[in-house]
Design a protein with these regions (language model features):
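Long, non-catalytic architectural segments outside compact domain cores
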Residues: 1-81
Length: 81
């Protein structure tokens, strides 16, 4: 991790909430947000060993959310063809 990055699960949650896009943001913005969160939580899982499994849960959650958004974007693209 680079200097200044979250080192605890709590810090990661705060970063996620601070950078959360508006509810009406473009789905591609939400996709980038979710994928970034997944990377963040995976990195924190390696550092905050006391919350390793919980951080991995959140990484998986964010990946699932990203998968849903990606599927919606693909469905929209197919229907536009």
């Amino acid at each position: 991790m680079r200097k200044g990055e979250p080192k605890t699960l709590r810090d990661a949650h705060e970063v996620v909430m601070d950078r959360r896009p508006p509810k009406d943001a473009n789905p591609s913005v939400w996709l980038a947000f979710r994928l970034g969160n997944a990377r963040l939580y995976k990195a924190v899982a390696d550092v905050d060993r006391g919350h390793h499994h919980e951080a991995l849960y959140w990484a998986g959650y964010e990946e699932r959310q990203a998968g849903e958004i990606s599927a919606e974007l693909q469905a929209e693209a197919k229907s536009a063809d």
